Amino acid sequence: MYAFLDMTISHVTSLLSLFFSFMNMRYAFAYGADAVYAGQPRYSLRVRNNAFDHDNLKIGISEAHALGKKFYVVVNIQPHNSKLKNFIRDLTPVVAMQPDALIMSDPGLIMMVREHFPEVSIHLSVQANAVNWATVKFWKSMGLTRVILSRELSMDEIEEIKQNVPDMEIEVFVHGALCMAYSGRCLLSGYMNKRDANQGACTNACRWDYKIHEAAEDDTGDVIPVTQLEKSTCCQNKDADEQHAIQQHQFGEPVLLQRNEEEQFAAEEDEHGTYFMNSKDLRA
């Protein structure tokens, strides 16, 4: 389950939760969630997990409103031209259900909603990667009522954004996935196994169990393993020897990440992050 803090202009904090079924939604409300959200069929990055068709969306929205809660519909896919053809037709019955807002990331889809449904409230999705107050101010000028900030921000940065755009609602993740690249625009799933996270098929490769191998470049420039540095997962306690070995790795030196005997992936790390260098990266 994911959770968010919604820091509104009234300084009231509310809790939001992602869900995939009526049971999830009812548990979320029973345990104090103020709002929930679910993806629109065909236009959400949660299409593999989403049990909500249009009929279920309508029931979910009605149940939420009957409890005095809010229900947001996520429309955050990165659309190709083919997805634009029927977008307004498919969205019209969803708008008629009166969700409290649409969560969106693509400027083109946002423009289309603004043109056809100017009364609908739009929240900027984390997929749009808002990381500074100028970006937040821009989206406010476009008529959006809330911005979901990228996970990469510190508390000080979030506070600075709120100070510079005090009348914009701010939403932040307090629990959830760790994306490769900026929040939501993940290349790792497609890189690892050709399942595109930006089209709703994320395999959560960021949560797999990896081994780390020291590596070096050979005469042809290929990265080859030297020795294994670490065997534990990110979520296990490491003993002193393992910690020492990891500390010996220097920024800028290549490593190999291994999931199983057949798969090894070259990576480099510096003070700014971790990099996977491969021609597959261009597919995004």
Where are these regions (language model features)?
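Conserved nucleotide-cofactor-binding alpha/beta core module
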Residues: 133-134
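N-terminal low-complexity segments that are often proline-rich with Ser/Thr-Pro
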Residues: 2-12
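Generic N-terminal leader/presequence segments
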Residues: 1-3, 234-235
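Active-site pocket-lining/capping segments in soluble small-molecule metabolic enzymes
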Residues: 10-16, 20-130, 149-152, 157-284
